[in-house]
Amino acid sequence: MIKIRKGLDLPIAGAPAQAIQDGPIIQHVALLGEDYVGMRPSMLVQEGESVKKGQALFEDKKTPGVFFTAPASGRILSINRGERRVLQSVVIAVENGGDEQLEFAHYPVAELAMLPREQVESELLASGLWTALRTRPFSKTPAPGSTPRAIFVTAMDSQPLAADPQVIIAEQLAAFNAGLAVLARLTDGKVHVCHAAGANLGKQPDAQVTYNEFAGPHPAGLVGTHIHFLEPVSLKKTVWHIGYQDAIAIGTLFTTGKLDTRRVVALAGPQVEQPVLLRTRLGASIDELTAGRLKAGENRVISGSVLSGTHVAGPNAYLGRFHSLVSVLQEGRDKELFGWIAPSPDKFSITRTTLGHFLKNKLFAFSTTTHGGERAMVPIGNYERVMPLDILPTLLLRDLLAGDSDSAQALGCLELDEEDLALCTFVCPGKYEYAPVLRDVLTKIEQEG
């Protein structure tokens, strides 16, 4: 077991009950362009056209052969583009339950471990489940024909308010194990299943599949942490990773021939009336998913974690491709007179500047207030408290802000994704957002080497 000591479990109110309920009937689903780093779509459908679940909607121009498929059957309601015609979303109006679908090849469970790699890749590409895989470094969809040094399956989640993966995997353990057998065909290295200490996920007889326990505060459950300790990456060493619900979907596809776009998500946060786990579908409309479940007031709905999720609004108001959590916070519009000098028992701080810091068992109703604007980046040790990886966070963050890609690469930025720096943003006394500057530097490194 690997136990980390640095990090932070955010003491936020509104954690969900760990029991799955059926969610509302979803009438609209969407694929979001922002979920896929560096993707340039070549559209294969038009507005008004009817599609089946699993039918290709567009192909990536940069990596031909990578298709993005419909998560439900219905009619293409809108294809939304932003500035410079960047794809925002492809919205589908679900019809007849949304389950009219294309059929794919399926196999007996005993044959999965013997399938040729090319056959596995071909079916994943055709079904669209290839896009569930992401590379590290750069967090992009893998190129067809490439081979990773290892594959990581993230079967734990330490993000604030997250669902317990063990509850979800227990319902579909056979499909999960089948998915692991299929994933093992894509690499000559290990398939690392990373789970929380004490979790019972069964065991694969295949020696290629290894189970790794992690314990400690967030980010113990992030794939970046797992990769850092087990298979550190570089420009010459690439690994892939995938979420546990996508591993279940792959197992279902190869054993039944049907594309499984079901998704269990946690609807949680201080502004949710009854935080709960809901069974819904991939790309579900957030407005429909949260209808009648939020407290009164001006709320900010986030697809993903409060630390690293996406504010949903307009054409992007749909469940993110890689999210299994919808968080809701109150918009912080109120101004506080002399708030910096008040004892503040209802405010949390990682430093000893508020009374709330000393209330160890208290849960806080966080809002979107940042309690200040941008200022100088002051190195007072906050970043080191929440960064368990073997890097120098203050120096790295400084170089990211300066856009110094050479120094940032030497300090380990290739191991990171936006979510890995979310805690650094949260505890930053200068109120900087480190995720976008990390992405800018990673893009520069990828282009220039």
UniProtKB/Swiss-Prot annotation:
Transport found in the keyword field: yes
Similarity remark: Belongs to the NqrA family.
Superkingdom, natural source: Bacteria
Gene it is expressed from: nqrA
Full protein name: Na(+)-translocating NADH-quinone reductase subunit A
Pfam family, one: NQRA_2nd
Subunit structure: Composed of six subunits; NqrA, NqrB, NqrC, NqrD, NqrE and NqrF.
Keywords: Ion transport, NAD, Sodium, Sodium transport, Translocase, Transport, Ubiquinone
UniProt-listed InterPro entries: NqrA, NQRA_2nd, NqrA_C_domain, NQRA_N
Catalyzed reaction equations: a ubiquinone + n Na(+)(in) + NADH + H(+) = a ubiquinol + n Na(+)(out) + NAD(+)
Listed GO MF terms: oxidoreductase activity, acting on NAD(P)H, quinone or similar compound as acceptor
EC number from the UniProt entry: 7.2.1.1
Family annotation (HAMAP family): NqrA
Organism listed in the record: Serratia proteamaculans (strain 568)
Role played: NQR complex catalyzes the reduction of ubiquinone-1 to ubiquinol by two successive reactions, coupled with the transport of Na(+) ions from the cytoplasm to the periplasm. NqrA to NqrE are probably involved in the second step, the conversion of ubisemiquinone to ubiquinol.
Coiled-coil stretches noted in the UniProt entry, renumbered to this chain: none
GO biological process, one term: sodium ion transport
